[in-house]
């Protein structure tokens, strides 16, 4: 059985708006081509009441991280109307990596509340304190666009500033029918010696997971017993976690000379696994081709024997495991370390890459031999790109996380339409002045997490993204992201 411990998430109390105001703002978000998250400025002074009558009516201005500065006494305020759903939680120690587990609850789930499963590995202060966590997160509510603040399990940090006490709630949020909208989190923990640099679940058999430890060991685990226990457990409105259980891995590979991060299961061939480290070796056949450490690997979604790798040497290499031990193609992708890559599952000719200088690029693999395959390049982020992933539901949409504490969502099909914007601005009393240098493909900006490490789209819940950072996890569903599956037959 899963033992239960109290680790309750408390939703943040929000200022309620009238239905007319919400509908007006919703229409504004849907019509605009550029929809970054609105960040409101709030100058808080104790003892002073706010008065809208004394403030002249002015257009809202988009606040740009790394460009605009906050004055003393100012802070950014989350706009909950920008989300269909937003929740946050902390598991004690930070998690560098996680993966969303496929389930049997349905392929196209759009109705709240949602239930999801995931696996994550910790980065604890001492090696014996680390573990792999199997998560069942249920009652993930939405539509009210409720925000859940960070929950601190260890330490003396307060959940909220004392100035925000009037916005907190000590009781569960309830929907109109009286049901709780607080997510319920249950965790089964497996002891893992050392920090987990990267963890991935096999797409065909999600109970089979592989972890890469900072010790250099790659271990394959069968987590079926723990997932079955979570699936059969009754939440009854309670969060819960188990003590770290001893569980022997199926395989313990120690062939790498040092630690690494690059690891990937094949989506086409069950059980086929790639791993690469600073010494660039792949189990079980060593391959050579990069002049520096390999940072990420991705199997092709369309060809069972082809994969891509990226490296600190600034290159991306394409490999065919049937042909020799050197890359079939290699090209210069960035002028800095290439940290992450993502292969588009809906348009397999497109590969995205993110670099250490904050830039990310889109490469068309059909034209590599003809010259520069780069079809798009963005320098919006100010710090290294830490994660990048194409949407499983929209071929032109991808999400990016960076060390600048931003998670951004991009739609490459968008173009700036000045005539449409001018017409919209003339018809709308409340509008946002868009910075001229803001890329028209930037669809959404999510902030509020510190030192973002990794993000993933949920393949079975369109529009849902989960991200991990130094201060915990966020589950978000932006309001302007399509929440239906594409018509693949079209």
Regions found by a protein language model. Give the residues of each.
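Beta-propeller domains
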Residues: 4-5, 29-99, 104-188, 216-246, ...
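Repeat-based blade/solenoid architectures
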Residues: 32, 88-101, 190-196, 297, ...
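Beta-rich catalytic cores
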Residues: 94, 114, 128, 195, ...
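Residue-level detector of Asp-centered blade-edge/turn motifs that repeat once per structural unit
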Residues: 102-105, 111-114, 203-205, 267-269, ...
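Per-blade loop-tip surfaces of WD-repeat and WD-like beta-propellers in eukaryotic adaptors/scaffolds
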Residues: 138-141, 177-179, 215-250, 257, ...
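C-terminal transmembrane module of eukaryotic multi-pass membrane proteins
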Residues: 397, 401-409, 439, 444-470
